[in-house]
């Protein structure tokens, strides 16, 4: 047995049962001494015939743990020549002592501090505890350490697979009479690669909801009708951008990104609220960014949106329009149509909000049906960092801002 600083150790977990097939080096039991816990492996492959020890029992070097069947005669003969007994037990045996605690325990066994619950979780994920750096007291491995290690492993596996993955397109022998060829633009090719990366690396979930924008629309129509410069008209999107900036201040996790930091998965929050807006151009979709949206009023946001949209469509985007990575993206299809859709998150962001066409719907106010203008909202989010409860709270907050635009003035 490896030196764990004591002659006697306590059995705290039995990892097998009678009839189990075990291989050499599979863990049989977990024992705990004064300094650490350790899993004791089988010295041979076979079937568990009998388990000798029980939880809470004190054992020492040479104690018989279990009896295995299905071992070749040479192994049996070798083991039968030595009789092992464990302390504080009335049982003795000269059977194949293949599960004995002995000084020749596999060199790969390393002392680790971990509870049985953590060890079971590590076995479930097929993770070796000796590969994990514990963050608990005196280096104890916690449940969070195992989960973090698993997430990092998945993260690295995905990164490796992405390096080997190309955008696959259909290949076949066709004639020009059968098909018409339309080549993708450089923007569309670049976009397709980014979309593939997002779809493969981010577990998407989409939360659908509707916001009552009846009062907002009444105000917007009145404001626009009084404008002398009609190029400065306000759109519904302007108010949504402002509402989202408020929500990002209230729920900063949506304004971050996932990173692998010091071998741990972490959410890094962006210092500024920079919202990307999907713009449809002849070359494909572009996502210029409005920086520091939370510091701007409705008129400033409207002016910035008009400028970057015109630059995107005329292929005159400045480096300043895209140099700061967006922290959140909004995709607006309301001017085209549709009721709901599932927008794909822009990697490495954590969420994206989709807007569809507003429709008048009947609303029951306890006395009668009244018409309400309802704006469909589709919030896609990264389920690794954001759970469903947080997503509902976020979209509910956005709805509140849009239903009563006085909140946007605060």
UniProtKB/Swiss-Prot annotation:
Keywords: Acyltransferase, Lipoyl, Transferase
Domain Lipoyl-binding: 1-69
Cofactor: (R)-lipoate
Species, as recorded: Buchnera aphidicola subsp. Baizongia pistaciae (strain Bp)
A GO CC term assigned to this protein in UniProt: cytoplasm
UniProt enzyme class: transferase
Protein name: Dihydrolipoyllysine-residue acetyltransferase component of pyruvate dehydrogenase complex
Catalytic activity: N(6)-[(R)-dihydrolipoyl]-L-lysyl-[protein] + acetyl-CoA = N(6)-[(R)-S(8)-acetyldihydrolipoyl]-L-lysyl-[protein] + CoA
Pfam families: 2-oxoacid_dh (PF00198), Biotin_lipoyl (PF00364), E3_binding (PF02817)
Quaternary organization: Forms a 24-polypeptide structural core with octahedral symmetry.
GO molecular function: dihydrolipoyllysine-residue acetyltransferase activity; lipoic acid binding
Record-listed E.C. numbers: 2.3.1.12
Note accompanying the cofactor annotation: Binds 1 lipoyl cofactor covalently.
Region (Disordered): 81-100
Peripheral subunit-binding (PSBD) domain location: 113-150
Signal peptide positions on this chain: none
Residues where N6-lipoyllysine is found: 35
Family: Belongs to the 2-oxoacid dehydrogenase family.
CDD domains: lipoyl_domain
Function: The pyruvate dehydrogenase complex catalyzes the overall conversion of pyruvate to acetyl-CoA and CO(2). It contains multiple copies of three enzymatic components: pyruvate dehydrogenase (E1), dihydrolipoamide acetyltransferase (E2) and lipoamide dehydrogenase (E3).
Active-site residues per Swiss-Prot or TrEMBL entry: 383
